[in-house]
Design a protein with these regions (language model features):
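A beta-strand edge to alpha-helix "cap/lid" segment located at domain peripheries
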Residues: 6-8, 18-55, 62-155
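N-terminal secretory signal peptides and thylakoid transit peptides that target proteins
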Residues: 1-12
Length: 155
């Protein structure tokens, strides 16, 4: 029995080392998928396409909404419709950091939110879930205002 265990361990060890680099490559590909998805999600605002926005939101998603959570796709869609009402987008966003769990099933994206003049006014934090091959949907979202600390200290 010990000999069999020794043989199995001896065979498995080199294979474990081989599996790691391909997993890293998979995570890189998944990071790119999530980055591309976040960029496409943000384009819905620029393109004024509320229906496309809703398509990125998971059925059971929760948007934290400054401590007043919006629960479910329908509630989120109804609340966000106002941001798509005018001809010009009231804000834009883009990811500057994306990370994926080793399982490849959840990801986090964070980045700046800009006003129409391009000034950073907030940062967002989104959690994405892999719902099918190459299909990521947002399950949690939050944002927070950023401090313009330099100008406040200058006054």
């Amino acid at each position: 029995m010990n000999r069999r265990l020794f043989l199995l361990t001896g065979l498995a060890a080199p294979l474990a080392g081989c599996a790691t680099p391909s997993r890293v490559a998979d995570l890189d590909a998944l990071r790119k998928q999530v980055t591309d998805t976040e960029i496409a999600f943000a384009k819905t605002m620029a393109n004024r396409d509320h229906a496309a926005f809703v398509g990125f939101v998971a059925e059971e998603a929760v948007f934290l909404n400054s401590g007043k959570p919006l629960r479910g796709r329908d509630a989120i869609a109804a609340h966000w419709k106002r941001f798509y009402a005018e001809a010009a987008a009231p804000f834009s966003w883009k990811p500057d950091l994306v990370e994926v769990l080793p399982s490849g099933t959840l990801a986090q994206s964070v980045g700046p939110v800009m006003n129409p003049s391009g000034v950073i006014v907030a940062r967002f934090n989104s959690i994405w879930r892999l719902e099918g091959p190459g299909v990521w949907r947002i399950v949690f979202d939050d944002g927070y205002k950023v401090c313009d600390c330099d100008s406040k200290q200058a006054s």
